[in-house]
Structures are given as C-alpha cells and as structure tokens.
Amino acid sequence: MKIVFMGTPDFAKTAFERLCDNKFELVGAVTQPDKPKGRGYLLMPPPVKEAALSHGIQVLQPQTLKNEEFKNDLKRLSPDVIVVAAYGKLLPNYVLNTPKYGCVNIHASLLPRWRGAAPIQRCIMAGDKKTGITTMLMDEGLDTGDILESSETEISDTDNFETLHNRLSMLGAELIVSTLRKIENGKRENLRRKQSNENTTYAAKIEKSDCVINFEKSNVEIFNTI
C-alpha cells in the first residue's frame, strides 16, 4: 500500500518516523516550504522534511497545492492512501479524491470536540480532564469526516502544552499504525463511523489576544491559560 505523508512540525514527524520504523511503503512526503528563522533569518527545513531526507524519501514542498506541477507529482506517486498530520493548509478536492483509500488525518482531539487548528491549547485552556487522538477520513469540511479510530489520555493538573503535545504525538504515531494496518487488511469500512455534530467545539488558532491574562477570571481559568 503506497503512502504519501503530508505534515510539517514535530507532531507530524513523530508519526512519520513511526511509519518508517514499521516498514510502510512511503513514496513521498509533502511539507511546507523552508522558512527563515532566528536572528539571521536563515532558511530552516520543517521537521518532516529532515526526517524524510534521512530515510531517502522524496520531499515535495509546493507553495500552493493548486499548481499543475504538484498535481502531476501527486498523480505520478499514485498513493493508495494519504496520511495527513498538521500539514498547515486545507486540501483541495482533487487531493482528497486522489488516493484509493482516501486521506486519513491524525487529529489531536477526541472529535467532534475541538475541531480546528489548536486543539491541544484549547483543551488545556478549557480545563478538560481528558483528550486524545482521532484518525479520520477527511472530507471538504473542517475536521468533519468519518471517524476511524480514537485513543484517549487524561490531562493532569501538571500538564502544559509541551507535555500534552509530546504525549499526543506518541499516541498519534501508535494510532495511525493501527489504522493503516486495518486499512491494509480491508477493514476500513468496518472502522468507519459517522461523526456526530452534537457537542461540537472549535479550536480556533491561538491569537495574541488569547495570551493576555484577564485577572477577572477565576484562578483556575488563569492557570489553564498560562
């Protein structure tokens, strides 16, 4: 089963490395372009690019997914499934419809709670006691596709973004291996279940205004924000 991996940051790199370790047939990695960082504004590669190159896997870094060159590259790679983890851009319909088994997203929440860009931060800020990872078949909506598998973890009072991010990245790596093995064995439709639209919450991108402490809030709310 040929796999194209689409992801950018460390969260995605953890899953990518796990797929390599488990000998999945990764035929390409799609990631964001290199970006300038630091005082010298030197171009730095995304973590997924570094991992892919270390394994000898072709890297694609399109500025936009709508250009003809990338469309042709994806068609040439002919993936059976595309795995998506924190890629950073919405996927156009032709990408969603390219692979035989669809695009499988590793999302860092227990959907339908915390659909959107910042599920880890938002669950901490809301004082949630548990969260997890969901693997889902992507559709045109924002994290609205059919759920394949999920795995939970508790959130302790001592957790912060870093500790929870690291735990969820490991959990996501484990879960995507499980999901892909079942897809390989023809069990995708057995896993597939419609995602409920009840009790939905949205994890909007963290803005500067979210980082301002409102001292009129309770001590618990202030602690969770920090």
Protein language model features and the residues they cover:
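Internal anion-binding site segments
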Residues: 197-226
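N-terminal Rossmann-like dinucleotide-binding module
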Residues: 1-40
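Donor/substrate-binding cores of folate-linked one-carbon enzymes
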Residues: 22, 32, 81-202
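N-terminal glycine-/serine-/threonine-rich beta1-alpha1-beta2 phosphate-ribose binding loop
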Residues: 36-78
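Short beta->alpha connector loops
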Residues: 8-11, 63-66, 87-89
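A structural microfeature
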Residues: 28, 61, 148-149
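Conserved beta-strand segments of alpha/beta enzyme cores
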Residues: 25, 56-58, 102
